[in-house]
Each structure stands twice: as C-alpha cells, then as structure tokens.
Amino acid sequence: MTVFPRKPALLVALALFAGAAVATAEAQSTVIEGRKLAFDRSKGNCLTCHAMQGGDLPGTIGPELKDIKARYPDRNELVAIIFDETKRNPLTMMPPFGRNRILTEQEINAIVDFLQTL
C-alpha cells in the first residue's frame, strides 16, 4: 500500500524549483560579497577611483560605474579589465588586481556580479 501516490512529474518540478531557488540565493550571496569587496578600501577599493551608487566619498580618476551590463555586455571583458587592464591599455592607472594577486579570481567574479547590477 502506498501512502503517497507517485507523481514523477511533480517530483521533478519540485526538484527543479528547489534547484533554481538555491542558485538564486547563491547568486545574491555573490553579489553581496562583490559589493563588500568593491566598497572595501583595503581590498577591492573601487571607490578610490570610481563613483558608484551607494558609495561614499568616491574618487574621480576612473569612469563612473553605472549601466555596466549595457556598457560591458560580455562579462568576460569586464573580468579581464579588473584582472589586468594593462593588457588592453598599457597606460592605464587601474591596478592589475588579478595579476598582482590583490584579488582572487573568485573575488573578481563576485565584484563583476555586483557591478552588473549597477
């Protein structure tokens, strides 16, 4: 005797929904971590050179960080810029955060996730 009828389609749908909810929570967590890094003056340090929404006392050396997803539709381009902008522009003042090991690959990806929300 089965107490619960077997409904494979329902079980699959519930599993997919649960997986999507976990993925969304992880993405939000990464964005929060990226925001912390971007505003941390001793680590990501974006505010030293860039103005961005929610940042206090921003610098004005670099461009304002807004409409990032529209300006950089290719996420990998933004990752490469943060990792080592000198490859694209040898005269840049932007530190090569990845090449100099200021930020890890995971931290750069978190910052990019955050910047894409601006």
Write out the residue ranges for each language-model feature.
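Positions in alpha-helical segments
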Residues: I32, P63, T92-P96
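Electrostatic cytochrome c docking/interface patches
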Residues: V22-R41
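Cys/His-enriched microdomains
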Residues: G44
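C-terminal capping alpha-helices of c-type cytochrome domains
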Residues: N76, I81, K87, R99-L118
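Extended, non-globular alpha-helical segments
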Residues: T2-K7, E77-P96
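Gly/Gly-Pro-rich "capping" loops immediately C-terminal to redox-active cysteine motifs
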Residues: F39, L47-F83, R99
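N-terminal export/targeting leaders of redox proteins
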Residues: M1-Q28
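N-terminal alpha-helical segment
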Residues: T30, L57-I61, P90
